[in-house]
Amino acid sequence: MFYCWNILQSDNKRIENYMKPNLRSIFFIWMLVAFSVEGYCGSREEYMLIMFWNLENFFDYTDGGEGESDREFSSSGSRHWTKKRFYAKCDAVAKSIMWMGDHYGRMPDLIGLAEIENKGVLYKLLKSTALRKYDYDIIHYDSGDRRGIDVAFLYRKSVMHPETVSVIKPEYDGQKLSTRDILHSSMQISDGSRIDFIVNHHPSKFGGEDESKGRRN
């Protein structure tokens, strides 16, 4: 599932909500329901297009010895996650992002991503697909998540650049949790303004509803 927002650089414009149709990948039975928030102002250059997408177990096809999920999503693992299937997913992801660009008349300026194995899979996504035509760069840090998946940003260097980047370690009852970090970046926009972006994605009921209740409140 992915979400898309147009972020206005004006505070007093009307916001409209609407749902876009489902998309289906040829290779994977994903229902990619896109929700959009679009604001209109005098020029299309007065807003940025911001997107979030949970890529759901975006692992490469090799077993790097980094845990059970890494073995599961490998050529020899239980998912039989081969090189061919990995690059097919890269192509499907790129086509969906390109669809957003066709629809809105510009490519997403910043994309928040969830369930990413490492920076390497994002590098392969950008270099092996049509996304290589665009000036995307990567912000990613490995977290302490038990399954080895993280959050990340892709951003267009012609539109913004990170002034600061930090990770926030989730805590509960004074103890750091072995889960995905919260990623925060303060971005300098090409028009001179600054916008802070935060992306996070956490297990909702890890360990069961009763076990996780305190951490969710």
Name each model-derived stretch.
Residues 40-83, 156-217:
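Active-site regions of metal-assisted phosphoester/phosphodiester hydrolases
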Residues 37-129, 139-143, 149:
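N-terminal, active-site-proximal structural segment of metallo-dependent hydrolase catalytic domains
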Residues 126-133, 155-157:
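Short, surface-exposed basic-aromatic patches at helix termini and helix-loop junctions that form
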Residues 26-34:
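Bacterial N-terminal signal peptides
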